[in-house]
């Protein structure tokens, strides 16, 4: 990504190739040199025309915080699962003391444990391990709080119009901004944005039946963000609930309705991103 920034700063047009041509891979196999050659050919012959993200503004700063937040969240979940496992398999006294505690209380209780050096070796080691994991969770909670605060400030500065949309929170807006990049004008059209988010309808018709299916490609974080917006609106927005009811009566499945709604939301978001 540093190379792309350097070339863009020098006035060189940088084309982004998301993935190698699958047909070429089937014929020639997979290797880094072959993928590089195929990417160069795709950019040279115009088959791929996506302009690379500039990665030099607020959105790139947001992306770095999102990476750190995702890592901290995953580490917290992992530590919590390890605490539950150790407390379940540990000595009876610890298991009884920690059973049924809520997550926050569990972290506090384990972080406050005092291992006794003269105790039986398994009990002592288990207390040390639980205390270590409990303190790790509390430290990660502080990290997440600091990251959330800074992330909220950056998202509000980068796209206040996005936060005003019904169903859009800081994390959702951050995912959509990262997908678009610091230079959303690189997106050729609203349809290109929908394809990037994995909500472009794909034909799945057969015979006289005309239908579409979900797109499994695209940016999965942006796709998940659109899904969260739709879920919020299906629960709290009267227009969306009326639409779902009408479509259900027409025979549409819930999955199809969600796909259509995600496409509508993608169109709404694109207009906000392209005209801040």
For every predicted segment, state its role:
Residues 1-276:
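A detector of single, family-specific signature residues
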């Amino acid at each position: 990504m540093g190379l792309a920034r350097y070339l863009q700063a020098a006035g060189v047009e940088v084309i982004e190739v998301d993935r190698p041509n699958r047909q070429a891979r089937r014929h020639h196999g997979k290797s880094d040199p072959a993928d590089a050659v195929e990417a160069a050919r795709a950019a040279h012959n115009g088959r791929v025309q996506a302009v690379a993200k500039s990665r030099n503004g607020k959105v790139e700063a947001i992306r770095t915080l999102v990476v750190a937040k995702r890592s901290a969240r995953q580490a917290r979940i992992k530590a919590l699962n390890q605490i539950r496992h150790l407390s379940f398999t540990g000595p009876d006294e610890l298991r009884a003391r920690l059973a049924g505690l809520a997550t926050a209380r569990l972290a506090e209780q384990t972080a406050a444990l005092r291992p006794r050096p003269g105790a039986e070796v398994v009990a002592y080691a288990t207390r040390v391990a639980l205390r270590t994991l409990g303190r790790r969770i509390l430290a990660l909670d502080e990290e997440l709080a600091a990251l959330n605060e800074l992330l909220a400030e950056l998202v509000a500065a980068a796209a206040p119009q996005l936060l005003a949309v019904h169903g859009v929170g800081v994390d959702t807006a951050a995912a959509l901004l990262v997908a678009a990049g610091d230079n959303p004008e690189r997106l050729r059209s609203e349809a290109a944005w929908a394809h990037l988010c994995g909500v472009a309808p794909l034909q799945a018709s057969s015979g006289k039946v005309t239908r579409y299916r979900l797109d499994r490609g695209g940016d999965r974080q942006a796709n998940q963000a659109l899904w969260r917006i739709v879920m919020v609106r299906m629960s709290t927005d009267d227009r969306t609930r009326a639409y779902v009811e009408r479509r259900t009566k027409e025979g549409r499945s819930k999955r199809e309705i969600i796909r259509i709604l995600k496409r509508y939301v993608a169109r709404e978001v694109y207009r906000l991103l392209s005209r801040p």
